[in-house]
């Protein structure tokens, strides 16, 4: 290329750079405007919430009024207040907010709010794919440890993978909750408990107690991964249909349990889930028995027994509550 052409090329680059600077200047101005609007919205929401709380407290005195019209008015206002809080939840999903304790400990005070629906859905979709791929890897790992590689070091690798998997799930779920996902209750706590359980399994030294429980735990892991794969496959299809009908939020997630929206076509999963829950109870009973063994010296045995019992109670009672609530609603619908 001749020097003259290089000079012409440089001249074009200079013009483009000037345009880029102007565009970037406008971008920074818009960003400042956006930050100002975000702060304004957050301020209005907090102020509105405080006033609604005060109003709800004032209305509480009229809860047992004998006047029918006043009673209906109070119920109507309380119902509207509940809807208003749901609207605030949706608004706050697009506004920067302080992270919860867990995210602060893991990530620090970093803004994790995604501003567009496209970005939120892409992150949710990536989370679901992560769960699917790791479920398959964990299934293969459990099968390999159970039937092929009978070494403590391979068990350690498998248990470390479980710890990393559940830790990562808790972080990603916390980010999704900050962005408007309505996953809550036991199905969030469940992963924290599973992280703890996997960590204790990782620290359990090799010995007689470990070898007695090893095959039972690996068989349980194989079954659990198979059920989780089934849940992902059928829940994702069900959620897609419900979102298309406008009956579910675009950030609703697949879970390792049973929720009310799954009654439409997913009740066949219940026997598999209940069998898995009772297997957790069986694990707890086995470990409680091992903890009383005369050769048991490891603290991990009793702690794991309590953790499996906690998982059983949480999973079983939560699933049972969903089933009971559904039957109660069906009874009310009958003439």
From Swiss-Prot:
Residue stretches in coiled coil: 1-39
InterPro entries, A to Z: TMEM120A/B
Keyword Coiled coil: yes
Gene Ontology terms: cellular component: nuclear inner membrane
Location(s) in or outside the cell: Nucleus inner membrane
Keyword Membrane: yes
Recorded superkingdom: Eukaryota
Membrane topology: Multi-pass membrane protein
Residue ranges of the TM segments: 100-122, 130-150, 157-177, 193-213, 268-288, 300-320
Pfam (any one): TMEM120A-B
The entry's keywords: Coiled coil, Membrane, Nucleus, Transmembrane, Transmembrane helix
Function: Necessary for efficient adipogenesis. Does not show ion channel activity.
Name of the protein in its database record: Transmembrane protein 120B
Gene designation per UniProt: tmem120b
């Amino acid at each position: 290329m001749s020097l003259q052409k290089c000079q012409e090329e440089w001249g074009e680059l200079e013009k483009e750079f000037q345009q880029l600077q102007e565009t970037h200047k406008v971008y920074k101005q818009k960003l400042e405007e956006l930050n100002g609007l975000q702060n304004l919205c957050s301020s209005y929401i907090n102020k509105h919430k405080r006033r609604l709380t005060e109003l709800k407290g004032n209305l509480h005195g009229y809860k047992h009024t004998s006047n029918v019209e006043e009673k209906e008015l109070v119920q109507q206002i309380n119902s509207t207040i509940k809807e208003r809080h749901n609207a605030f939840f949706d608004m706050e999903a697009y506004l920067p907010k302080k992270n919860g304790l867990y995210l602060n400990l893991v990530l620090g005070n970093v803004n994790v709010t995604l501003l567009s629906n496209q970005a939120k859905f892409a992150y949710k979709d990536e989370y679901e794919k992560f769960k699917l791929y790791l479920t398959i890897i964990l299934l293969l790992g459990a099968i390999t440890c159970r039937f092929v590689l009978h070494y403590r070091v391979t068990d350690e690798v498998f248990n470390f993978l479980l710890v990393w998997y559940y830790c990562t799930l808790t972080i990603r779920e916390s980010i999704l909750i900050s962005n408007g996902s309505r996953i809550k209750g036991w199905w969030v706590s469940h992963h924290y408990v599973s992280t703890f359980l996997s960590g204790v399994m990782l620290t359990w030294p090799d010995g007689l107690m470990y070898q007695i429980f090893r095959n039972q735990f690996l068989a349980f892991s194989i079954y659990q991964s198979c059920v989780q794969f089934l849940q992902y496959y059928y829940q994702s299809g069900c959620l897609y249909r419900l979102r298309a009908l406008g009956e579910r939020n675009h950030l609703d997630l697949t879970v390792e349990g049973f929720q009310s929206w799954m009654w439409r076509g997913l009740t066949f999963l219940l026997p598999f889930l209940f069998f898995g829950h009772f297997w957790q109870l069986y694990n707890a009973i086995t470990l409680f028995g091992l903890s009383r063994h005369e050769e048991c010296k490891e603290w991990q045995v009793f702690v794991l027994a309590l953790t499996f019992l906690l998982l059983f109670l949480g999973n079983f009672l939560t699933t049972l509550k969903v089933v009971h609530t559904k039957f109660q609603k069906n009874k009310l619908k009958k003439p």
